[in-house]
Amino acid sequence: EEERRSYIQVLDQKSMRLKVLIEDLFEVSKASSGTVTLHPEHVDIISLLKQVRFELSDKMSASGIEFRFNLPEGRVILYLDSQKTYRIFENLLVNIAKYGMPGTRAYIQVVREPEGYVNISMRNVSAQELNVSPEELTERFVRGDSSRNTEGSGLGLAIARSFVEVQGGSMKIEVEDDLFRVVIRWKENAQEGKEAREGQNQERQNQERQNQEGSLGAEEKPGMEVYRGPE
């Protein structure tokens, strides 16, 4: 009876992995052929990245890797499909958690370039020396390690690249021995980016003005309540 339950459990696990494989293969095939349906909207990728980080916090902690995020203050608005972009970030962070070396650090950074592009980079140390080229890593079913002893379809990077490119961006992978780095580059919507930066500057100026007024008010009339206007 115990042996039978064990066999059933193994079959359930294999069935689930096959289901994931089929779904992932279907997704990457649609994206590669250009038949994927997009629902673009103005997305704050900083908030989205923080959401992915929160929802993967247990998996990231269990990996033994220290994830360091260097994110700009305020919003970075891009015109993207939020669900597809979430999947991109999720796949890349899960890839680090699965294949990164425990006890090392992973660095995630978002940088606005002067010429109107936004770069999202993730770099980490692989648990094993990467024995394939960057091009091969984004091919279907390639994982970059010879043991292939971890769960997954091997499609994570391929899906991420396809979803980046179908949304007008580029995804570059750099490999040197056991060092792994991926850089996503998207063009920022000029008007939205300008409005977001102006909004951030205005918020910063308002905060500085309020701090100065509060300081002056406190010096002139201690204990006086300073009216800030409607919330």
Residue ranges of predicted features:
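Short beta-strand/loop element within the Bergerat-fold HATPase_c
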Residues: G103-G116
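Short alpha-helical segment of the dimerization/phosphotransfer core of two-component systems
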Residues: Q13-L18
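Conserved catalytic submotifs in the C-terminal HATPase_c
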Residues: H39-H42, S61, E66-V76
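Short conserved segment of the HATPase_c
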Residues: E129-V142
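Conserved micro-motifs of the catalytic ATP-binding
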Residues: S33-L38, I77-L80
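Short helix-loop "hinge" at the ATP-lid/N-box region of the Bergerat-fold HATPase_c
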Residues: I96-A97
